[in-house]
Amino acid sequence: MMMEYGGYFSSSAVAQQSGDVPTTAPSAVTNSFFYTPQSHNIYHQYATPYLQSGRALTTAHNTSSSSAGNSTSSSSSSSNYRNTTHDSLQAFFNTGLQYQLYQKSQLIGSDTIQRTSSNVLNGLPRSSLVGALCSTGGAPLNPAERRKQRRIRTTFTSGQLKELERSFCETHYPDIYTREEIAMRIDLTEARVQVWFQNRRAKYRKQEKIRRVKDEEEDPLKKEPGQISLEEIIDQI
């Protein structure tokens, strides 16, 4: 019994001196009491899976590191490509495209403005002061062309003229409501009816003046001195 305890303590001392290294060779404890071929087989049984798992972890770590390096390099290269492409596009947009668009828009705008201004000035009547000063040149219009440019006269039918004459006998100065009513009855615009009444009043004044002259020639004593007739008052208005 004493020899067994002595072998145990001697093996413990050897294990402490080796620094508790897990990979101690079996030869370091060959003289130990507990070293047997069975314990050596058990050591290899447990050590081999751990070593294999360690190698597998190391290989996986190296593979992941290499893949991470490849992905980092690919991402950096793609980012560099994107940055280069973005810089190229930005330089293109900042130099060529804006210049071309500005030049084209400037040319189109100036041509359009010039054509529009010339058309507006050419559309002005030459008889007016603005048309005479701003005309772009060319020979003045002859009377035939001026007649063509005049407004087309309205041709009244017999029924329209009868209705207008009847309304004129009722009043020489119809208001806008009366003119609109007349225009609706004879299928004309209110502006045409107003122009007709203006022309009819002018014609009526001329007829009344001619009639007065004839009356004075036939009977000069009929009119007393200083007397003003109603027709003269209307003519003065």
From Swiss-Prot:
Residues 62-82 have a biased composition (Low complexity). Coiled coil: none annotated. Pfam families: DLL_N, Homeodomain. GO terms for biological process: axon guidance; neuron development; positive regulation of transcription by RNA polymerase II; regulation of axon extension; regulation of transcription by RNA polymerase II. It is found in: Nucleus. The keyword Hydrolase does not apply. Gene3D superfamilies: Homeodomain-like (1.10.10.60). Disruption phenotype: ALA and SIA axons exhibit outgrowth abnormalities, failing to run along the lateral cord to the tail. ALA axons are shortened further in a vab-8 mutant background. Drastically reduced expression of let-23/EGFR and plc-3/PLCgamma in ALA neurons. RNAi-mediated knockdown causes severe defects in the ALA neuron in young adults. Keywords: DNA-binding, Homeobox, Neurogenesis, Nucleus, Transcription, Transcription regulation. GO terms for molecular function: DNA-binding transcription activator activity, RNA polymerase II-specific; DNA-binding transcription factor activity; DNA-binding transcription factor activity, RNA polymerase II-specific; RNA polymerase II transcription regulatory region sequence-specific DNA binding. GO terms for cellular component: nucleus. Residues 149-208 bind DNA. Probable transcription factor involved in postembryonic differentiation of the ALA neuron, and regulation of genes that contribute to behavioral quiescence, a sleep-like behavior mediated by ALA. Regulates its own expression and also that of homeodomain ceh-14, together forming an autoregulatory loop in the ALA neuron. Involved in fasciculation-independent longitudinal axonal navigation in many neurons. Belongs to the paired homeobox family. This is Homeobox protein ceh-17. It comes from Caenorhabditis elegans. The lineage of its organism: Eukaryota, Metazoa, Ecdysozoa, Nematoda, Chromadorea. The gene is ceh-17.
